[in-house]
Amino acid sequence: MIELVFSYIFSALLLTLSHRFKSLELKVLIKSFAFTLIAIATSLMYYAGVLDVVSLVLGISFSAIAILVSIYAIYYAREQHYPESLEPIIDLFLLAIIATYTSPSFIMLVITWTISEVLGFTLIRMGEEHSIEGSLTSSRGFILTSTMTYELSVFTMITLSLTLTSASVSLMELSKPFTSTTLTLNVPTPVIPLLVLGFLAKAALIPLHFWLPSAHTAAPAPASAVLSGLTVSLGFYGLYRLLTYLRLNYATHIAWFFVVTGALSTLYGGFQALSQRDVKRLLAYSSIATSGFISTRFAMYLIRPSTATLWGLVLGILMHAAYKTTLFSEAGLVETVYGTRYIHGIRGFIAVAPISSIGGIASLFTMIGVPGTIGFVAKIVAIYSVFSTYNVDVALAIAALIEILIYIIISALIALKYVHLYYGEKVAIVKPVVLRAPTGLQAPILILGLSNFVYSFTLLGTGIYELWLPLLVPIPLAMVFLYILAAHFKALTERVLHHELGRG
């Protein structure tokens, strides 16, 4: 574990050092090396038996995302005239989040998670102060709801372990790697709500969802991408790690709670997203809907821990990270190009930002569930895992299946609403302030979007061999479809813009 901690510290020093250089190429190189170092350290700790496969997959995947978001933040801060401190805070925030997902023990997880909460609050506060809207309530909602409830759950866990075991044994076990700890606690039923409260708030499940839309809207775009794509899922990751230590006597009842709250979150978040004009609020509410979907995946794992249910949970987290970091980054580009986030009057974005639009459309493919994307894989594995729990509780399996189908429909509807940003029948109301979006902002979004295809190959390492064929066969078709669709939209919107310029 010492080697992993050293890699965190060394990477933090490299990221801090990168901001002293004026050369963009050198900055990009140092940032890429720092996050790659974390991915390498994660792999080494996995092969040493310190980390499990969940930390391995999420650690490497999120390190790749971190490189792209970090590079995007360089250009975003300049275009939006943010203080120079935005870049290093974003980098340290990314590092803290990855360190949380790759923490080998509960104690280290608590430390890195707390650091990420402080940095997240700082970024939201920075966005509030930079915004012309002048709202100063989002950061307070974040710190009071997301952060304080999490600290309450951590305090409950540590107190419970100290009460049920000796202090020395408890702290020693909580400091051991998750892969080797032997601590098992019989949790009294009245204590369970206190244990899960903070994780529910972080996941923004109903009724603890209210802090998320304003916080994710107020933050700078790269921070919103990380807050939504990576930190919301920490709630479910924390619950997964909590199960390492707990012996639950009412697992089925708790699973029902997660399915019901998941369904409510999917419905509420989905319908709210469909009624939004602000692109960041649309994406924020869709995060609540996706949290509902992942909540159902966690419920299935809770009643029957297996390869299928575990990967159903992990792939749901990966899906959310891939498409949400892409679209929130694109939201920042939309604001840069048009000077507004209200997309109901924007058409023809693909002509202004042809490179990044391919990444954005790839993310919409994930939301729709186009074969070959991580969205398709996550939804297929989710349905498969439900059938694997059918013999445990039939009613629960049926309820979970209904929730998944609801999410599939709502997610597709949100994607169809968003796609009008690129093209549409109506003449654009809002005109771009630049003829071509900066390439420095477009390129990271393109690669982030393509991760929706790359991450689908995660299925090959799950051991669910019967699902390999549906993954592999349609991928070339999806890539061809993406190219044809992008070319069509570009030609269409260029004609519309040419017509408008001719009228002017």
Roles of regions detected by a PLM:
Residues S32-A99, A225, G235-R241:
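Hydrophobic alpha-helical transmembrane segments in multi-pass integral membrane proteins
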Residues M1-F10, D52-A64, F106-L119, P188-A201, ...:
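Structural signature of hydrophobic alpha-helical transmembrane segments
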Residues E25, L86-L183, Q272-Y342:
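Alpha-helical multi-pass transmembrane bundles of energy-transducing inner-membrane proteins
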Residues I294-R304, K379-L396, L401:
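Interfacial segments of multi-pass membrane proteins
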Residues V50, Y75, S85, M126, ...:
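Short helix-boundary/re-entrant hairpin motifs in multi-pass inner-membrane proteins
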Residues A12-L24, I67-H81, F121-G134, A203-T217, ...:
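C-terminal ends of transmembrane helices
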Residues V5-Y8, K31-S32, F62, I90, ...:
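Residue-level recognition of transmembrane alpha-helices
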Residues S131, S168, I350-I355, A412-G504:
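Cytoplasmic/organellar membrane-interface segments at the starts of transmembrane helices
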